Amino acid sequence: MKSYIFVHQGVSDEIEFALALLGYIVIRLPSFGALGPYVCCHPDSLLFPLPDGRLLMHENYYRENRELFDRTGLRFALTDEPVGAEYPQDVLLNALALRDVLYGRLDSVSKTVKAAYNKHVGVKQGYARCSVLALGERAAVTADRGLEKALLSQGASVLMLPPGGIILRAAAPSGFDEKGKKIKPVGDAVRCDGFIGGSGVMLGEDTCGFFGDITAYKHYEQLQSFARSHGVRLVSLGTGPLEDMGGAVIAGLK
């Protein structure tokens, strides 16, 4: 079985090599000009894994990168719903699915995503998937009080951590925006308010990999204790500070 992992185009060679050693075929996602610089390369803003195995993306993004996606042999679903660079127009696909429950800013989430789930829980946080590090189907980590409350209401075990300490880096979008205008490049701006969910990804049922050195994260001990209690081990995919890279999306071919 081929297992593809879709990641931010800016992941280091070190991280790509670590994922390849685990058996994944690594696909670096190009930027999408319709989105803003901080999320234009983020998998959790570009792809949504539907329950039927298809990956949902905006039709314009697919058109721009058709050859890249088609050569995987995976199945895709497309949407032409409005998307933009400003919040909350950029959260179309940034919803969280956990135990068959969909969490998100429901007035901004794709209709296709909502139609795939019978149970919806609305939250104020538009970047729901990026804000939550899911450790399997029953445990989650977040810094967002609204999401904590929503997850607890559905029986999930939740670790609440303070925000901060996670890098968020702007990328230079390429191509054209939703109005057909050429995207102006931006500088390599860096912030330290990234989300915990965007800094890691579950690699199988019992391992969570992180973009950076998870042991250097200031809340590592607390996170490790919580993860261990749920049978999950934490591994660093790279060195350097923890970075919000929009998580990753894994899809396989049998």
What are these regions (language model features)?
Residues 1-254:
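Histidine/cysteine-enriched polar flanking segments
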